[in-house]
Amino acid sequence: RNACANAAANKINNARFICADATDWMRAAAQPNSGLPHPDVVFLDPPREGSTPACIDAVAAMKPKRVVYVSCNPETLARDLMFLVRNGYKVKKIQPVDMFPHTNHVECVCALSRR
């Protein structure tokens, strides 16, 4: 609801917001003839454990032009990026973001595009 309200307040009418389990939605949307839209850009911000293999498989199957992956865990980030790179994506930029100063935690925002 907040995303929709923010879009309306800013007169953004070219975005669609979906509230669902990411793995379930991506798997359903990746099916041929699902009737669900294949997005141009996929944003992933999984928990510390990283994305599920099924969700990453679905992202690769949908072949969006770009993927933005936000991660708080370098190990799972490396694992998931390796899979995306093997499936036709190139890492364009990785930007660490210190959201928790004076701790050893850092978020990384990764921009990928299809080769």
PLM-predicted stretches and their roles:
Residues 1-115:
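Rossmann-like S-adenosyl-L-methionine
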